[in-house]
Amino acid sequence: MESFMESLNRLKEIHEKEVLGLQNKLLELNSERCRDAQRIEELFSKNHQLREQQKTLKENLRVLENRLRAGLCDRCMVTQELARKRQQEFESSHLQNLQRIFILTNEMNGLKEENETLKEEVKRLRGLGDRPKPRAKEGTSDPPSPLLLPSPGGWKAITEKPPGGHEEAEEDHQGVGLRGEEKPAGHRTSPVAKISPGATLPESRAPDMSPQRISNQLHGTIAVVRPGSQACPADRGPANGTPPPLPARSSPPSPAYERGLSLDSFLRASRPSAMTHEAPKLSPKVDRLCLLNRPLSLHLQSPHSSPLAPAAAPSDPRLQDLKAREAEAWEEPTELLGLPSALAGMQDLRLEGALHLLLAQQQLRARARAGSVRPRGQPTPGEMLPSLPVGSDSEGPENEGTRAALAAAGLSGGRHTQPAGPGRAQRTEAAATQDCALDKPLDLSEWGRARGQDTPKPAGQHGSLSPAAAHTASPEPPTQSGPLTRSPQALSNGTKGTRVPEQEEASTPMDPSRPLPGSQLSLSSPGSTEDEDTGRPLPPPHPQPPPHPQPPDLDGHPEPSKAEVLRPESDELDETDTPGSEVGLSSQAEATTSTTGEGPECICTQEHGQGPPRKRKRASEPGDKASKKPSRGRRKLTATEGPGSPRDAEDHSPSPNSSPWEET
C-alpha cells in the first residue's frame, strides 16, 4: 500500500514536471512564432517598399529611355532654351530698330518735302521781289539801254552760279539754232522791252533770268573779270547759285549802290534769257577777248581809276588829264598783245555805263541831290532833268568822278588827253549818253568790218530806234557775227544806256538830227519782239531819220561800226553775211543797208534776217549805231566845243577799234 502510494506520488511529481517542461517549450515556441510573425511583417513592409521603389525606378527608366530615343540630353535642353531666349531678344531688338529706322525715314522725307516747299517759297518770293522792282522803276525812269551791266553784287551772283546756268545757256542756244527766227519773242526782247511801262514780265521767264544767262547776255563778247581769273563769262559756269565779283571799276561800291535797287534782280527781270544762247559759240572767240581782261581789271582796280572816288570831279582838268595818261599807259600792254587798244577803251566805257546804270537806281536820291550836282558839272537843267530818272548824271560827286575817270579812261588810244572843264563835263555826259543810247555789240565780221569803215554814222538813228531795234539786242547765235564786242560807247553800256533817255532829251537841242527820246521809249513793246523773232520787219514806231554820214573822228578815222570791231572774230561766218543782214530792227523795214565797200552806210548791225545768229547784237539796232554814230553826230557838236573835250575822248575811243580790229 505504502508502496503504491509512494509510487503514485512519484508518478504525479514526474507528470507535473513533464507538464511544466512542455509548457515551457510551448511558451518558447509561441514566442518564436511571434518573433517570426514580426519578421514577416517587417519583411513584408520592406518588400512593399521595395516594390514601390521598383515602380518609381521603372518609371524613371522609361523617361530616360524616352530622352535617349529623342537624342537630347539635359545640357542640350538648357542650351536650346538659352538659344531660344537670345533669338527672341534679337528679334525684338531688330523689330525696334526697324521701327526706329522707319520713323527716322519718315521724318527725313518730311524734312525734305518741307525743304522743297521752303525752296519753292523762296524762289517765288525772290521772283515776286525781283519783278516789282523793275516795274517800280518803269514809271520813274526811261527805258534803260538794252545792255545793262549788273551791280557788283550782281556780278558775284552771276559768276558763282553753278555750272547749270551755262548748261541752260547751251540748251537755249541749241533751241535757238533749231527754231531759228521762230524763237518766241520773249526770248529776243531786249531788257528795254521788258522794263518799259507797256511791257509785262511773263511768269515763264523766271528760269531764264539766272545770273549766268544775264552774264552771258551782257558779257558774252567782252570778258570783264578779276585780274586773277582767266575764264570768260561765256566759258565760266559759275559755281544757282552765287556770283563772281564785279571786276569793273567799282572798287569800293558806294553806299548808293547798296541802297539802290539791286541791279542783279533788275537784270533778271529785264534780261531776255535768249541772250545766253551766245555762250556756247562765243567761248572760242571770247578767249581772244579774255586777253584784255587782266589789263582791264588791273587798270580798273588801280586806286587812280576807281570811278567811285568822290574826289575825282569831272570839273577838275588835272584829274581828267591824269586819268587820260593813266588810260594811255594802261592801253599800251593790250596793243603790245596785238589787240586793238580801242577795245580796252570800250571796256572802260562799258564799265562807265555800268556805273551810271547803278547810279540810275538812285534816281530819287539823285533828284534830291540834283541841286548839289549842278554846281559841279554845271549841266544845263535840260540835261539834268532827263538824266535824273535814270540817275546817270545826277548822282553827285561820286558819279561825276566816275564819269571823269571813265571819260579819261575812254581815251584808250591816248589820242585825246585834254582835261575837261565843267562845261566840257556837261558835253561829255551828253555825248556819253547819246553814244550809248542803245548799247549794241560790235560786229567783228569781215563784212561788218568793211562796212564799219565806210559806214556813215546815222545821227538820227539813236533816238529813233524802233522796239525792234531795241529788241534786236536780243542774243542771236554768233554764227555769223562771232562774239560781238561793244564799241567803247557800247561798252559804256549800262551807264550810257541809262543816260540814253537823258541824252536823247538833253541832246535833242544839241543834235537836231537826233530824234526825240520818246521814239526810243517805244523800244519795249513785246509785240515788236515777236515780230523780230519771226523775222518780219517791224515798222519803226517813230519815223527813223535817214542815216546821216558822220564826220570822221578827229583823228581822221571814221568811227568803226560795232560790226567793224567784231569783224575779226567772225570772219568765216561773216563771209556768208550780206549787208542786208545788218539792217537794224527799226530800219529792218527800211532796209538801210548798202554794199560794204560803197562808203559810209548806215550799218544796222542787227538784222532779223540773220535771226538767232546775231544773238548778242542787242545793241545791233540802228539805235545802237546811233549810240556810236550819233556820238559822231554829237561829236560834230562837241568838235566845235573843243577837240580835247571829254566827249571827244569818249567818241574817239571807238576809232582805234576799227583799225586795230581790222589788223587783228
Curated annotation (Swiss-Prot):
Positions of region (Disordered): 125-284, 369-664
Biased composition (Basic residues): 628-637
Biased composition (Low complexity): 516-528
A Pfam family assignment: CtIP_N
InterPro entries on file: CtIP_N, RBBP8-like
Biased composition (Polar residues): 481-496, 584-597, 654-664
A GO cellular-component term linked to this record: extracellular space
Regions that span the bilayer: none
Compositional bias ranges of the Basic and acidic residues kind: 125-140, 437-454, 554-570
Biased composition annotated in UniProt, kind: Pro residues: 241-255, 537-552
PANTHER family the record matches: RBBP8 N-TERMINAL-LIKE PROTEIN, RETINOBLASTOMA BINDING PROTEIN 8
Name of this protein: RBBP8 N-terminal-like protein
